């Protein structure tokens, strides 16, 4: 188990600065969305072999794993031009990620927040995009990791299993598991049962966990929280992690420097028998 962070939570930095900053903050791994993380890379069009080599060597020097090359694309969008750009960019990212030595290329399956009807309409387009992306993943031998989100076409366990079965290549199609993005009804969900069901079904293809916590205000508006201070219950996830013998990346999203050290301690506790429940002590 390695503890990491979404790099652009620290804002955009110079290429030579980011890895040292993450090392100093005691992280071991990172998720990199290059245009969001680095000055001098305004878009994917600005990625060059020279910049990739700068990033690779700086992270290697600081012993920071690039757990996820983030290329979050609108894969389910019915608009042909939008989807063509999404798939083409995802394919390019396979080569870029390979050059960086990244563990996986990560993506969700949509940009907007979709209602149920639209999620169903977008699913065939999502599936087509994933299949086309997988062709490149296999060609360059760079795993693609898909991230389910309840308001996207990849909305639930059943859809996720359907995609995994249709692709049928566990070596190249992996998963990022963000439990908070699957908690549609925090007030009524039995999280222990829910996360156990997910992990029993697809745990073997999960390489990365996104770790965050939140509360809902009186207007039901999402509010990021320190780990253990919100509605998330990580007990079942902790039990699963304790059994894993392979490397799993735990990446903090929505990092806040006010309680970043406490959050790192919380994440470290998830992998051991000392985890005492959902709330921090």
Residue ranges of predicted features:
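N-terminal pre-domain/capping segments
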Residues: 1-102, 174, 268-281
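Active-site acidic/histidine proton-transfer and metal-coordination neighborhood
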Residues: 16-17, 53, 58-61, 75-177
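H/E-rich (His + Asp/Glu) clusters that bind or coordinate divalent metals
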Residues: 226-230, 235-237, 242-244, 248-251
């Amino acid at each position: 188990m390695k503890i990491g962070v979404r790099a652009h939570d620290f804002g955009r930095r110079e290429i030579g600065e980011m890895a040292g900053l993450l090392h100093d903050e005691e992280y071991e791994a990172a998720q990199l969305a290059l245009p969001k993380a680095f000055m001098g890379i305004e878009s994917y069009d600005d990625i060059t072999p020279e910049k990739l080599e700068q990033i690779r060597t700086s992270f290697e020097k600081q012993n920071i794993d690039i757990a996820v090359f983030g290329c979050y694309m609108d894969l389910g969008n019915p608009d042909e031009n939008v989807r063509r750009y999404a798939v083409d960019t995802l394919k390019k990212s396979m080569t870029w990620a390979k050059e960086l030595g990244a563990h996986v290329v990560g993506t969700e399956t949509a940009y907007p927040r979709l209602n149920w009807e639209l999620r169903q309409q977008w699913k065939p387009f999502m599936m087509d995009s994933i299949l086309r992306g997988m062709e490149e993943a296999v060609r360059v031998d760079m795993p693609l990791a898909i991230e389910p989100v309840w308001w996207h076409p990849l909305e639930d366990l059943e859809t996720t299993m359907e995609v995994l079965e249709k692709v049928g290549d566990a070596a190249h199609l992996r998963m990022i598991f963000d439990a908070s993005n699957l908690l549609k009804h925090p007030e009524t969900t039995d999280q222990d049962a829910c996360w156990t069901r997910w992990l029993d079904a697809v745990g073997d293809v999960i390489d990365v966990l996104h770790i965050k916590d939140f509360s809902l205000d009186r207007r039901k508006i999402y509010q990021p929280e320190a780990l253990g201070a919100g509605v998330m219950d990580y007990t079942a996830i902790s039990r699963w992690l304790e059994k894993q013998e392979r490397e799993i990346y735990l990446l903090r999203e929505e990092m806040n420097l006010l309680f970043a050290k406490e959050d790192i301690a919380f994440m470290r506790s998830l992998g051991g028998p000392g985890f005492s429940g959902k709330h921090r002590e």
